[in-house]
Amino acid sequence: MTTSVGGPSSGSSNLKSSQLAAVTNMLALSSANGNENGGGGSSAPSNPYGRGYDNKPGGGDDNPWKILIYDKHTRAIISPLLSVSQLRSHGVTLHLLLHSDREPIPDVPAVYFVQPTQENLSAIARDCSRHLYQRSHLHFSTRMERPVMEEFARLVVNTGGLDSIASVHDQFVEFACLENRLFTLNVAASYVLYNNPGATEGDMDGAMNGIAGGLFSVVATLGCVPVIRCRRVSLLLTLLLYFSQ
């Protein structure tokens, strides 16, 4: 699914630059609410819908050098925004897939940028229990539901990895921006699913929730409230009902 953002080409409607600002702010190792320790950080505005939790250690400045850990989905989000050299200019010395063999680097902090799936959360908890990195800053591409967050917190505590986590943030950037005002939700095989006579109601609910979450990320990144018009009985109206939840 690839969609363009309408309207005149202006800074306020430049989706790619807005998403880039959110991602570079994430890489600055600064809190979404400001760096309480007074260390350096990006001046780019954070996503107005984002939320975060900081578990800052006492004293010390943020280390500008870091490791970036992503999954295949979030790699597709970052790739159109930042080249390898640009990542290095933001202090990223190494970027690795979450589900790959990774050696411990205990003297360097890590920025995790992944989807909040059960598989990803279990992998992060294992990393924290092994203390692979100095501190871990967790950034999720979309909202992590409260029950999932509570289960993740219990898992981290039970495995002894809580001290490894520096902060947790919802970023709401669940889309890949290909051009200034062109994006894709990277929904695999969506046409097949929607036209599959064997698809269950649960399958359709999950797909619609995913699309609604991606569209919410777009408007959250732009910092605007959309005006959407559609017929009273239509698939778009069904999608908007998911979007409003």
Can you say where each PLM-predicted feature lies in the sequence?
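Extended, well-folded catalytic/binding cores that form a central cleft or groove in large enzyme
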Residues: 1-245
